[in-house]
Amino acid sequence: MTANLAARRWWMIMPIIFITYSLAYLDRANYGFAAAAGINQDLGISKGLSSLIGALFFLGYFFFQIPGAIYAERRSVKTLVFWSLVLWGACAALTGVVSNIPSLMAIRFLLGVVEAAVMPAMLIYISNWFTKRERSRANTFLILGNPVTVLWMSVVSGYLVHEFGWRHMFIAEGVPAILWAVCWWFLVQDKPAQANWLTAQEKRDLDAALAAEQAAIKPMRNYGEAFRSPAVIKLCAQYFCWSIGVYGFVLWLPSIVKNGSALGMVATGWLSALPYLAATIAMLAASWASDRLGSRRGFVWPFLLIGAAAFAASYALGSTHFWISYALLVVAGAAMYAPYGPFFAIVPELLPKNVAGGAMALINSMGALGSFVGSYFVGYLNGATGSPVASYAFMSAALVAAVILTLSVKPQARDAQTLGAPLQGKMHQ
């Protein structure tokens, strides 16, 4: 019965959340192709302002994470994500009809606002349906929407901007989110008890397994207590630094590739896709091994260290060896994405359910702030220096800081094996 239940949950839930998060990532990441395809010249945007506009999404994303997570935890993930889909699809499509810089800035900020709650809501949704031993893989299937989307989006966006221009690209890639909102509404149930495709016994078994996990976690009274815990504070700082590298890479990779290779937009799209193919493979391998070995932290920091080393090597090469630097960027992209599943499995194993969703939202909001910093400063450094070399050093340093912070997280003794922490003396939270 357990095997049948597990198989049914994977097939009924994972495709839905994968598609949903893929559409969210599509509408936030395609600005890099517009920047490479002439939006700056068409609207009279300077290089410095282009960096700010590209990063404004993450500023809106930062402010509305926690309110959205609280609503999802206490009320309904289904309702929250439905309206988010409709609104972000509309904002993304409207980007294609902007005629001036202020309207573009407003839409980029609003896009971040309406997408803000989706990631923490999805993580809460996964924690309602999957047990501790499954969560790293479940998180990975959610976050696979990132690299898989950028993989095909790089090719499709490159073609669209080449054939039709950046305006048609935004419109064509915004409409699917609105259409998918209808599918989401009819396919999703918030809790196992509401699912008509589970038997009564399967519902009881799943509820019992999830309740048993909660009984093993130290209780916390409220969000304030959770937010003040050393582990949450360190994970916030870690995700801030990690996201500097990830989104500095994601948003400006098309421009780096186009300028360095001197190829057209279609070829740029194909080259920009390859790091995300490598990232997809790395994420699947890391999440499977993390659940199999029961280790979380041990599948986070080594990959981030590899990413830092790849960026550092690109910095050392300078701007005269593009193809070697490009190969290192493929390595860096795979290494930065690989740890997502294990990382987001840490918090539900440290904190009780009544505060875990809010804590994940806080951590994700700090990641959004790091994404803003990475998006802005990588774009700024590329424009100010005329090459991506300085930004490689910046992203490498951020990932090294993330490695140090990951190693500093000390779980409770009973959670040490799960987090893969070395036991040296008495462990404490």
Predicted regions located by residue number:
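Cytoplasmic membrane-interface "Motif A"-like loop-to-helix N-cap segments
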Residues: E73-L85, D291-L304
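Conserved MFS/SLC helix-loop-helix module at the cytosolic interface between two early adjacent transmembrane helices
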Residues: F63-P102
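Helix-breaking motifs and short loop linkers at transmembrane-helix boundaries and internal kinks
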Residues: G44, S76, V97-S103, V114, ...
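C-terminal transmembrane helical hairpin of 12-TM major facilitator-type secondary transporters
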Residues: R296-I346
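Extracytoplasmic gate region of multi-pass secondary transporters
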Residues: G32-F33, S229-S287, Y340, F344, ...
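Helix-loop-helix hairpin linking two adjacent transmembrane segments in secondary transporters
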Residues: L142-A195
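Helix-to-loop junctions at the C-terminal end of transmembrane segments
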Residues: F64-S76, M283-S295, N382
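Cytoplasmic helix-loop-helix junction between adjacent transmembrane helices
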Residues: I107-G145
